Each structure stands twice: as C-alpha cells, then as structure tokens.
C-alpha cells in the first residue's frame, strides 16, 4: 500500500467540492507566513477546519422503506405540522416537517432521507436570515426536491443560512435515489427540511443531534428490524 493510500484510509474523506477551498486556505496561509509566521499557523488551523467542514465519511444507513433517515448532520431545530412550500407542488394540506440545522462545524453533505424517484426539483431565490428561525423555511433561498416513495411524495428542502451562499444539488428529475445516498451540499451553515405525508410519526425531538444517513427521524407504521448497509 502506498503512502497516499495509507493517508486516504486513515483520514476522514473530504468531498471534492472542498478541494478548491482547502487549496485557497493553504496558499493564503503560506503567503501570510512571509509577513508574520504566527499568521501562517493560524492559517493552517483554518485550513484544517475547512477540510473538516467538507468531510464526507461513510455512514451505516438503516435500510427499511418505512424509515425516514436524517438528510443532514446537525441538530433537530423543529418538529411541526405546517403547510409545505408552494413550489414543491405538494398541495395545501399540512404535513409533518422535521428540520435539521447545520452549523459551521457540522458536515454539510446532504443525503436522501428515503429511497425514491425524484419527481421535481424547484429552486427559489430568497433572503439569508438565520436558518434556525422558523421563517427561514419560507423566506430564505432554497432548493426543494420531491421524492416519490413507497409512502407517497415527500419533500426535501435545502435552505441557505446567514453564512451559506451556495446550495449544490447533484441529482436530477427522474433520477432514483437510495436512502442515505448523497444528493447535495450547502456551504457554511444551513438547514434541511423534510416534509412527510400523513402516517409518518416523528422519532426525534427538538435539540436532538442527528447524523446524516444514520439517524432515524421518523417512520411509517411499525418498522421491522432494519438491515444495516454501508454506503460509499
């Protein structure tokens, strides 16, 4: 095994979207070192933080069509019944919404909460208020996905925050996603909302820590014992 392979297998993987930012932080750190050496070391610490921010580790995803898995690392900021954003086309009936807030220290790779087919992708320009606030669901810049699942259509909404200024979504309409599969990323602090139809019961509470691709945030009916499968 080569040295590069050893390092790659030892360290937490970094998503390719972070390579450019890590390189910029590193080069700037070297440049600052010519001005004053302590600045270089501060820059290296920030470079390490940048790499940590874009971390993309493997996750053990429970595989069960009745389970809803957290789409993001972070803290559950809301569990409520609300009307979904109109651009999702999910109607005006209230749905269960579970929100996960990601601060700048959480990983920001987003994963599908259930297996299904992407029926709609809808982007909406907006503000950049604190993503922890309830009004962020309606006022902030956001990108929504509608997934056709065994239990009907669900909504997954990427919401920009105070610092976040770039929402990335790699999937496309008509694509099939598996539970826990990566579909997007939001840079530097943000939030994910999951909208679920009748029959879904929350399995998390406000303030609880959630792990993308692993934490069960809701379920339909009585889920059977989940099969554990490693995701790439």
UniProtKB/Swiss-Prot annotation:
Binds 1 pyruvoyl group covalently per subunit. It comes from the Bacteria. Is synthesized initially as an inactive proenzyme. Formation of the active enzyme involves a self-maturation process in which the active site pyruvoyl group is generated from an internal serine residue via an autocatalytic post-translational modification. Two non-identical subunits are generated from the proenzyme in this reaction, and the pyruvate is formed at the N-terminus of the alpha chain, which is derived from the carboxyl end of the proenzyme. Keywords: Cell membrane, Decarboxylase, Lipid biosynthesis, Lipid metabolism, Lyase, Membrane, Phospholipid biosynthesis, Phospholipid metabolism, Pyruvate, Zymogen. Belongs to the phosphatidylserine decarboxylase family. PSD-A subfamily. This is Phosphatidylserine decarboxylase proenzyme. GO terms for biological process: phosphatidylethanolamine biosynthetic process. Pathway: Phospholipid metabolism; phosphatidylethanolamine biosynthesis; phosphatidylethanolamine from CDP-diacylglycerol: step 2/2. Its cofactor is pyruvate. GO terms for molecular function: phosphatidylserine decarboxylase activity. The record marks 189-190 as: Cleavage (non-hydrolytic). It catalyses: a 1,2-diacyl-sn-glycero-3-phospho-L-serine + H(+) = a 1,2-diacyl-sn-glycero-3-phosphoethanolamine + CO2. One of its GO terms (cellular component) is plasma membrane. The modification Pyruvic acid (Ser) is found at residue 190. Catalyzes the formation of phosphatidylethanolamine (PtdEtn) from phosphatidylserine (PtdSer). NCBIfam families: PRK05305.1-1, PRK05305.1-2, PRK05305.1-3, PRK05305.2-5. It comes from Sinorhizobium medicae (strain WSM419). The gene is psd. The active site is at 190 (schiff-base intermediate with substrate). InterPro entries: PS_Dcarbxylase (IPR003817), PSD-A (IPR033175).
């Amino acid at each position: 095994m080569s040295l590069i392979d050893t390092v790659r297998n030892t360290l937490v993987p970094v998503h390719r979207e972070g390579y450019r930012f890590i390189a910029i932080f590193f080069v700037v750190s070297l440049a600052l070192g010519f001005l004053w050496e302590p600045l270089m070391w501060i820059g290296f610490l920030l470079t390490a933080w940048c790499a940590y921010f874009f971390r993309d580790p493997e996750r053990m995803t429970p595989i069960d069509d009745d389970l809803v898995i957290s789409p993001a690392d972070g803290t559950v900021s809301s569990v409520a019944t609300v009307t979904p954003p109109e651009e999702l086309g999910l109607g005006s009936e209230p749905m269960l919404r579970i929100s996960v807030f990601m601060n700048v220290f959480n990983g920001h790779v987003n994963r599908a909460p259930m297996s299904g087919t992407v029926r709609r992708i809808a982007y909406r320009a907006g503000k950049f208020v604190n993503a922890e606030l309830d009004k962020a669901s309606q006022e902030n810049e956001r990108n929504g996905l509608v997934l056709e699942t065994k239990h009907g259509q669900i909504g997954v909404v990427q919401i920009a925050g105070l610092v976040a200024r770039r929402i990335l979504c790699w999937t496309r309409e008509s694509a099939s996603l598996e539970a826990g599969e990566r579909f997007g990323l939001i840079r530097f602090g943000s939030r994910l909302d999951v909208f679920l139809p009748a029959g879904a019961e929350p399995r998390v509470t406000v303030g609880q820590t959630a792990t993308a691709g692993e934490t069960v945030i809701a379920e339909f009916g009585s889920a059977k014992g989940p099969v554990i499968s490693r995701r790439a």
